[in-house]
Swiss-Prot record:
Keyword line: Acetylation, ADP-ribosylation, Antibiotic, Antimicrobial, Chromosome, DNA-binding, Glycoprotein, Hydroxylation, Isopeptide bond, Methylation, Nucleosome core, Nucleus, Phosphoprotein, Ubl conjugation
Protein's name in the database: Histone H2B type 2-E
Entry similarity comment: Belongs to the histone H2B family.
Organism (species): Homo sapiens
Cross-link (Glycyl lysine isopeptide (Lys-Gly) (interchain with G-Cter in ubiquitin)): K35, K121
N6-crotonyllysine modification, residue list: K6, K12, K13, K16, K17, K21, K24, K35
Positions of modified residues (N6-methylated lysine): K117
Modified residues (N6-lactoyllysine): K6, K12, K16, K17, K21, K24, K44, K86, K109, K117, K121
Length: 126
């Protein structure tokens, strides 16, 4: 029985490498689109809290989604507060109030104190 003709070998199952830069007809390389995420910041905080602990790419994706979700909720609430008070600028006060409204009890208190500390550090460094 003759064997079927084999085409180019299929990439290995674990291989996730893809062609990043494709050649165009005129010889120029196409620029790879940048994907923004909070992963480097999540990693820095993880190393501050647990220096000997790592994080999987799946867990990093979940953390990135979480940070994006919280950011959108706080920004939306702060925008609503500014609109209610007929203001066109979102200040740290709107952000603080939005955090108090969105986060429960003790978590809101800690978030507000850390935020205040960060704003103070930023203004003193200017």
């Amino acid at each position: 029985m003759p064997e079927p003709a084999k085409s180019a070998p299929a990439p290995k199952k674990g291989s996730k490498k893809a062609v990043t830069k494709a050649q165009k007809k005129d010889g120029k390389k196409r620029k790879r689109s940048r994907k923004e995420s909070y992963s480097i910041y999540v990693y820095k905080v993880l190393k501050q809290v647990h220096p000997d602990t790592g994080i999987s790419s799946k867990a990093m994706g979940i953390m990135n989604s979480f940070v994006n979700d919280i950011f959108e909720r706080i920004a939306g609430e702060a925008s609503r507060l500014a609109h209610y008070n007929k203001r066109s600028t979102i200040t740290s006060r709107e952000i603080q109030t939005a955090v108090r409204l969105l986060l429960p009890g003790e978590l809101a208190k800690h978030a507000v104190s850390e935020g205040t500390k960060a704003v103070t550090k930023y203004t003193s460094s200017k």
